Amino acid sequence: MSEELLPPTLQNILDQKSLKWIFCGGKGGVGKTTTSCSLAIQLAKVRESVLLISTDPAHNLSDAFGQKFSKDATKVNGFDNLFAMEIDPTSAIQEMVEQSDSNGMMGSMMQDLAFAIPGVDEAMSFAEIMKHVKSMQYSVIVFDTAPTGHTLRFLSFPTVLEKALGKLSTLGSRFGPMISQMSSMMGGEAGSQEDMFAKLESMRAVITEVNTQFKDPEKTTFVCVCISEFLSLYETERLVQELTAYEIDTHNIVVNQLLFPKKSSNCEHCSVRHKMQQKYLAEAHELYDEFFHIVKLPLLTEEVRGPEKLKEFSEMLVKPYQPPQD
């Protein structure tokens, strides 16, 4: 195993005061939520205000802190400047549709056309979330993302909305006058087509601006969370490749749930598992040592739940964990 070139902590994230967006992502069940909550706690010590957002429909933030969060930013108990919110992208789009002024035939037809394009509903709900978040003026925003696969989908959203705008524009210019006439004859409101265009256009502008920020390493970074097993490491490598292709900065990997059996321990299961973990940990070092901070966290005997346990756990992100000696 080559010598570690970069400190095995996330202190670099706390030191980089220009960061605005921090994503924590990886395979399901590797401890993303615990990591993102712990990182947010550490950031709250050095930044003016921190917002922690979960876009995972499983809503693990409430479980982690033992406090109910909703789609509105709520102050986390025990902190003055840490806020959390849980968003379900699918319900966000539903609410938006209900709130939008879609009376009359034109409005509903335009909506149907827009949503017939794959990914438009997700893109629009993401834009709504971003519009909301941007208006809130937090110093830094930490995303606890859904498991890998969904994580990077938002990067294709500007293209998706461009497509929706193009399609609506073509259909609107062909059939718009006729449908508007029919709509007004049936008592519908005029201008629904323009409303729909305006909504899509403003959302596209928001997503394009946000994506530009996501590609700026001064403003955005992605923390990959994994465990020391083949599938998780494979998934992490895929994630790193994808992030690189999308030009999103990533230079921190958190390896969770590591076993450190005592020499005197005669637990066969523990030593076999420890050996396997060390093998994949060596591979991780080989792959990432040069450009990544690799943070090693232990498998604990109890769950990390509640503000106090999370505060305690968060210290291991900035001070390397030392396994107890025999």
Curated annotation (Swiss-Prot):
Assigned keywords, A-Z: ATP-binding, Cytoplasm, Endoplasmic reticulum, Hydrolase, Metal-binding, Nucleotide-binding, Transport, Zinc
Binding site for ATP: K27, G28, G29, V30, G31, K32, T33, T34, E229, N256
Cytoplasm in keyword set: yes
GO CC terms: GET complex
Active-site residues (renumbered): D56
Binding-site residues for Zn(2+), renumbered to this chain: C267, C270
Keyword Membrane applies: no
Domain of life: Eukaryota
GO biological processes: tail-anchored membrane protein insertion into ER membrane
Pfam families associated with the record: ArsA_ATPase
Listed GO MF terms: ATP binding; ATP hydrolysis activity; metal ion binding
Protein's cellular compartments: Cytoplasm; Endoplasmic reticulum
SUPFAM superfamilies noted in UniProt: P-loop containing nucleoside triphosphate hydrolases
EC number: 3.6.-.-
UniProt main location, coarse: cytoplasm
Known partners and oligomeric status: Homodimer.
Purpose of the protein: ATPase required for the post-translational delivery of tail-anchored (TA) proteins to the endoplasmic reticulum. Recognizes and selectively binds the transmembrane domain of TA proteins in the cytosol. This complex then targets to the endoplasmic reticulum by membrane-bound receptors, where the tail-anchored protein is released for insertion. This process is regulated by ATP binding and hydrolysis. ATP binding drives the homodimer towards the closed dimer state, facilitating recognition of newly synthesized TA membrane proteins. ATP hydrolysis is required for insertion.
Entry's family note: Belongs to the arsA ATPase family.
PANTHER family cross-referenced by the UniProt entry: ARSENICAL PUMP-DRIVING ATPASE ARSENITE-TRANSLOCATING ATPASE, ATPASE GET3
Protein name: ATPase GET3
Record organism: Coprinopsis cinerea (strain Okayama-7 / 130 / ATCC MYA-4618 / FGSC 9003)
Gene responsible for this protein: GET3
